[in-house]
Amino acid sequence: MSYLCDASRATLIIVDLQEKLMPVIDDGALVLQRAVLLAQAAGLLGIPVIGTAQQPLRLGRTVAPIDALLDRTIEKTSFDACAQAPFMAALCNGRDELVVLGCEAHVCVLQTVLGLLHRQRRVKLVSDAIGSRRGSDKQAAIGRACAAGAEIVSSEMLMFEWMGNSDHPEFRKILKLIK
């Protein structure tokens, strides 16, 4: 059974939005825009934001608009971030709802989602904030993640669920971000 996303239980995980990778991502500008929007909303709502960077010496640093919004960045060499002890340690924060976005959808994002699910974690995959070089790879990743047990959400769906209602103290600020 699916539950509404809960800001008090959430951690936002931004996978590998890096300088040399983003220019080759299909609809990369939209992926980045959605990622920035979610990271800003997470900041307003007190949701931890963890980033990963796959071999930054080869793929570049996390892109500046995202880097400025991260609470922590974990460098990695494995495609599945769960294979990195610092990543798993960062998730020991008492929050059990892991919201994943980033690139590439069919490699590091998918393997991290599968790794989290294997570890019995609750995972939400943000469909409009993930990307691959080819759209068909992104769609295959969404299908596989869903079949494995991840819930597929959109960025706006997520933000409105995080707030719960229009009386939320940050509603106006987040609405302004969305529009």
Q: Which stretches of residues belong to each language-model region?
A:
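N-terminal nucleotide-binding beta1-loop-alpha1 segment
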Residues: 11-17
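Active-site-adjacent betaalpha module
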Residues: 2-11, 45, 57-179
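A short alpha/beta connector and helix-capping loop motif
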Residues: 7-10, 25-56
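Active-site loop/turn elements of alpha/beta-hydrolase fold enzymes
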Residues: 17, 54, 128
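Short acidic, Gly/Ser-rich segments with clustered Asp/Glu that frequently serve as metal-coordination loops
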Residues: 19-23
